A protein has these predicted regions:
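Long, acidic (Asp/Glu-rich), low-complexity accessory segments flanking structured domains
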Residues: 24-211, 224-256, 261, 276, ...
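Surface-exposed substrate-engagement region within the catalytic domains
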Residues: 300-357, 368, 411-511
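Fungal secretory targeting signals
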Residues: 1-23
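Intrinsically disordered, low-complexity acidic segments that are enriched in bulky aromatics
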Residues: 233-299, 303, 323
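Conserved, mostly hydrophobic/aromatic
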Residues: 219, 264, 519
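Long, low-complexity intrinsically disordered regions of secretory-pathway proteins
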Residues: 359-410, 558-561
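Active-site-proximal loop/turn and secondary-structure-junction residues that shape catalytic pockets
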Residues: 222, 268-270, 333
Length: 561
């Protein structure tokens, strides 16, 4: 009897633990209602899920909603749920259904209903938001029925799609996603670092551009005449993709999506020999040549036509409807100036640099960031041979594959044409494209939120304030740096919490006068940050109308359950 009672009590003790262990995967959905209409729940159903959606999401509010699949059945489970909202008061019937699916992979989807459509998403569209365990996916709908709504899943070529609205605006007046340490989507050479504590992106630059990034943080390092990207603290860290690979990614994107403005922001340059944190003028020239002769759509400027501050000129200065893309390279103020005029890119076959047999061949698929011993790429990973006597500073040759798609199409036209012009490649000193803002240097998401919102308020009192760069990244905790067996403590793992704070908190700081121009993040793995920022292109929202008319308009409100 005593043994039976003991077994019974033991069973009661273990059952709750078992339930906790077998609890299913969950996450968060951020619903941002940036329309003048309340969203009213008219239908909901769930099977084996936590799925408690609010009856109403008022106009101009946001709602963070938790959801959870009860059972982890892998890619073929039958847990699922739906919640349908209608836009109350919309002149044309409009609704959407939030769907949770498990079969063929867990994901959250948005199914448009009635006559609802948005920029790039026609009536009846199905938008896949994806899913990240304990992370956040975003659905935003902005605007009203008098024009096109702006929503999740924006067009890949979003600048061309919104050019009628943003063309007359300057870089100070629009918003763009920015890739933090964009070249660190793989580790090619290791110097005491591994992917867990040096890799900041899970997809390469091409895919980051597809997902909407237009400002790329590129950190060049030269080793024996070859250019890489880096994530280093002193001499500790790792090299990422080569500059040649990044050039190929950009050329591929601009060929497929003409008319987009891309800024490469060169920072944290390094000379691997003796770990010098500055480049020599000769090395800068090598890098300039590699970029200028490699990039198909390198923008050129007429110094006589433009002001010193390029952040104040209209976007249509750089790209126009149907034009080719424009790639600008922003360099530190201490970098030497490029030569005043440039050679014709259309060189003969004998004049072109030869192929680089060491060019990387990494794919554009998401990489396994959790393997400490597997590094994509074909370079030596332990830094061996770096300290050999090798003073070969021969400039890196440009692979034929970079220039294979080069065209001789007309460069974007510049305003106020003159009879005599001197064009120079757009290597722009930082002071000519000034930015404000700084990263928070914290491993605490709440501090990150407060710090970035404070800086947003401080640096953006008006739409004509300098470009504000809002950096939503988590600094890896010291104890997490060697914890390579735990993906959640990696740099990309930390991005989950940073993204959640961004999606839930940024609305508190937004108005028609106060908004970030750049949102810089780790792990741009989908287009949801682009969707968030594309709401800036909506004209005549209720908030803007109220502010222009001098009437009261409440701040965006949270309606968390």
């Amino acid at each position: 009897m005593h043994i039976s009672r003991l077994l019974f009590r033991t069973t009661l003790f273990l059952v709750p633990s078992t339930i906790l262990v077998t609890a299913g995967p969950g996450g968060y959905l951020e619903l941002a209602n940036l329309t003048p209409y309340d969203w009213k729940l008219k239908y909901t159903h769930s099977y084996h899920m936590d799925w408690q959606f609010p009856s109403t999401i008022p106009a101009r509010t946001t709602q963070e909603q938790y959801f959870e699949w009860w059972y982890d059945h892998g890619p073929n489970g039958d847990c699922g749920a739906e919640a349908t909202y209608e836009l109350v008061g919309s002149p044309a019937p409009a609704s959407f259904t939030v769907q949770a699916r498990q079969r063929k992979g867990r994901r959250i989807e948005i199914q448009y209903g009635d006559q609802l459509s948005s920029l790039g998403n026609p009536v009846g569209s199905l938008i896949t938001l994806g899913y990240t365990h304990d992370g956040t996916v975003l659905f935003v709908l902005a605007g009203n029925e008098t024009g096109s709504y702006v929503s999740s899943n924006p067009p890949v070529a979003w600048m061309q799609a919104t050019l009628p609205t943003i063309g007359s605006k300057s870089l100070r007046e629009i918003a763009m996603p920015a890739g933090h340490d964009a070249g660190m989507s793989q580790v090619t050479r290791a110097y005491g670092g591994i992917a867990h504590n040096t890799q900041t992106q899970s997809v390469h630059v091409y895919q980051q551009l597809i997902y909407g990034a237009r400002w790329l943080d590129i950190r060049p390092v030269i080793r024996k005449g070859r250019w890489y990207t880096n994530h280093l603290t002193g001499s500790i860290g790792a090299f990422g993709r080569t500059i040649a690979d990044i050039i190929k990614d950009i050329n591929r994107f601009t060929k497929e999506n003409p008319g987009e403005l891309i800024v490469l922001d060169l920072t944290h340059e390094m000379d691997r020999k003796n770990w010098k944190p500055r480049l020599t003028p000769a090395q800068w020239k090598m890098l300039y040549d590699l970029l200028y002769y490699g990039l198909d759509d390198f923008w050129t400027i007429d110094q006589m036509d433009l002001p010193d501050d390029l952040s104040s000129v209209p976007i249509e200065t750089f790209v126009q409807a149907g034009s080719k893309s424009a790639v600008l390279v922003r360099v530190p103020d201490h970098a030497p100036a490029f030569k005043t005029t440039f050679q014709n890119k259309d060189m003969t076959g004998d004049e072109k640099p030869g192929p680089n047999e060491n060019s990387n061949t990494a794919t554009d698929e998401p990489l396994d960031i959790n393997s400490p011993s597997t590094f994509p790429g074909n370079s030596t990973l332990d830094g061996s041979g770096d300290d050999d006597d090798d003073d070969d500073d021969t400039p890196e040759s440009i692979p034929d594959t970079i220039n294979s798609n080069s065209t001789s199409t007309t460069l974007p036209s510049l305003p106020s044409p003159k009879t005599s012009k001197t064009f120079t490649p757009a290597f722009i000193p930082a002071h000519r494209l000034p930015t404000v803002g700084s990263y928070s240097n914290t491993d605490q998401p709440t501090y990150l939120e407060n710090d970035q919102l404070t800086k947003l308020s401080l640096y953006r009192p008006s739409p004509q304030s300098p470009i504000h760069q809002s950096t939503w990244t988590i600094t890896q905790h010291l104890a997490h740096i060697p914890d390579f067996a735990n993906p959640s403590t990696s740099i990309i793992g930390d991005a989950v919490a940073a993204h959640r704070k961004l999606f839930s908190a940024i609305w508190k700081g937004l108005s028609s006068k106060t908004y970030p121009n750049l949102i810089e993040v780790d792990d741009i793995h989908d287009n949801q940050i682009a969707a968030l920022l594309k709401t800036r292109s909506v004209e005549d929202t209720p908030r803007q109308q109220a502010e222009r008319n001098g009437t009261a308009y409440a701040k965006f409100e949270r309606t968390d359950a």
